């Protein structure tokens, strides 16, 4: 049976092809369209995927009605997330199955890790209603241990600070991470903590809580900081606080699991400057090479099949 996993209509669209339980192909739309971080599918990637045959089943990386409800509650207005209608634009038909956004992330990481048991940690900007989730992987099962709602999203906050520095949110966070090396992290860290984050020192039932709803960004914060060095210092403080919060989340994870294996997923797993911290708390670490929404094209399928696969390596996409 040919199964397609799809992550699209969001950012970094991707498509994965499974023949039975074997991953045959996974690629991002941008490789075919040449549009950086392309959010949509295109005829080229679809035609390439069809070389393995038309899909009998299609697996979508998130649950559309939950996403629409959250957008409505957050004041974004009603946004249509009709998957069937979206796929019809590309002449894609087949039985459509959906899964929750964070479960797709968790499945993409755990079932490719090679671990038979692991703590799975997903940190991103937002997925339906959640921004942080912790899972216990045991054998072929993934059990949700904890989740944190999007109003307390460390990923959304990092994206808001990316925008505050004049960069494109949900795309140019890597630039902010690089800018941090040029700034003084101590100049603004205290002010930033005071203005944004409530972090009770001993409350490990609540790893973090934000004072502001960052859905609409934080352009209002410290409008007096406009020079290039100011922006470097904002970046440095942001990165330093992110690393503080990551350590707090890792410490919190250890209260939920005794595993020494960690699977780290979600867009925040791309913060390579901070990832060294995970080895302070876990012995073995797997970060799937596409931990963001692109990798959820694979995870959408694995969340349903619930089977470990032989990870074929990173060269499973576009033929160079």
Pin down the residues of each PLM region.
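Short acidic/glycine-rich loops and adjacent helix/strand connectors
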Residues: 1-320
């Amino acid at each position: 049976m040919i199964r397609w996993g799809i992550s699209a209509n969001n950012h970094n669209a991707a498509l994965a092809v499974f023949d039975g339980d074997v991953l045959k192909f996974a690629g991002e739309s941008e490789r075919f369209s040449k549009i950086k971080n392309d959010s949509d599918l295109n005829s080229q990637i679809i035609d390439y995927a069809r070389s393995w045959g038309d899909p009998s089943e299609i697996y979508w990386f998130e649950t559309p009605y939950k996403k629409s409800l959250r957008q409505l509650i957050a004041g974004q207005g009603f946004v249509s997330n009709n998957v069937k209608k979206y796929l019809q634009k590309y002449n894609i038909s087949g039985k459509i199955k959906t899964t929750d956004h964070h479960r797709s992330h968790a499945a993409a990481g755990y079932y490719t890790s090679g671990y038979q048991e692991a703590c799975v940690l997903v940190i991103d900007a937002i997925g339906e209603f959640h921004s942080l989730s912790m899972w216990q992987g045991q054998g072929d099962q993934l059990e949700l241990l904890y989740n944190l709602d999007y109003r307390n999203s460390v990923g959304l906050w990092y994206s808001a600070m990316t925008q505050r520095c004049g960069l494109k949110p949900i795309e140019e966070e890597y630039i902010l991470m690089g800018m941090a090396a040029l700034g003084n992290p101590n100049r603004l860290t205290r002010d930033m903590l005071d203005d944004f984050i409530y972090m009770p020192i001993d409350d490990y039932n609540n790893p973090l809580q934000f004072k502001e709803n960052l859905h609409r960004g934080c352009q209002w914060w410290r409008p007096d900081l406009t020079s290039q060095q100011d922006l470097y210092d904002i970046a440095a403080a942001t990165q330093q606080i992110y690393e503080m919060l990551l350590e707090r989340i890792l410490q919190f994870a250890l209260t939920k699991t005794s595993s020494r294996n960690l699977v780290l997923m979600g867009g925040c797993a791309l913060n390579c400057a901070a990832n060294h911290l995970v080895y302070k708390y876990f012995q073995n670490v797997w970060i799937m090479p596409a931990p963001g929404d692109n990798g959820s094209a694979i995870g959408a399928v694995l969340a349903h099949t619930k089977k470990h696969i032989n990870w074929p390596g990173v060269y499973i996409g576009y033929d160079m």
